[in-house]
A protein has these predicted regions:
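Metal-cofactor-dependent catalytic cores
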Residues: 1-147
């Protein structure tokens, strides 16, 4: 993992199961409560991340243009690779996240675009899930580094 700075490109909160991913400019993350306002409250998967570059690559491969919010991740990041980073600590603004593993794409990916689920099953293309180590606010545009 390098110290190259990335950027937080988007934040989405899911307020209801199977509900839309609502874009926000800022969100609060808390180790005890997860992503504040999000219906997902798993202790293991408190927040999910997707690489903007990987998503764009998938869209090129599939000759499609699907909004990355279709992935249903909470944070869209650029400039940092999530590939095989389990156990790594990512800092976004003042918030620290511990990468727990690769997210597994569900059938909803094929609802968004036929064939997307299979393509996302390779090399962490579906993103990563994390636990919140240090709480605080994250904002679109925040710098991202590995610590």
């Amino acid at each position: 993992m390098t110290m190259t700075a990335g950027r937080l490109e988007a934040i989405w909160i899911k307020r209801a199961h199977r509900g839309p991913m609502d874009p926000v400019q800022e969100a609060q993350l808390d180790p005890a409560r997860g992503l504040i306002g999000s219906v997902d409250r798993s202790r293991r998967r408190q927040v999910t991340l997707l690489e903007a570059e990987r998503w764009a690559g998938l869209m090129r491969e599939l000759h499609a243009e699907v909004d990355p919010r279709a992935r249903r991740a909470n944070l869209l990041v650029s400039g940092v690779s999530l590939y095989q980073t389990r156990g790594g600590v990512l800092q976004i603004g003042s918030v620290q996240l511990v990468i727990g593993g690769e997210t597994t794409p569900c059938e909803r990916m094929d609802e968004a675009l036929p064939g997307l689920r299979a393509r996302m099953g390779n090399a962490w293309a579906g993103g990563a899930f994390a636990q919140i180590r240090a709480s605080g606010a994250v904002r679109v545009g925040d710098p991202i580094i590995w610590v």
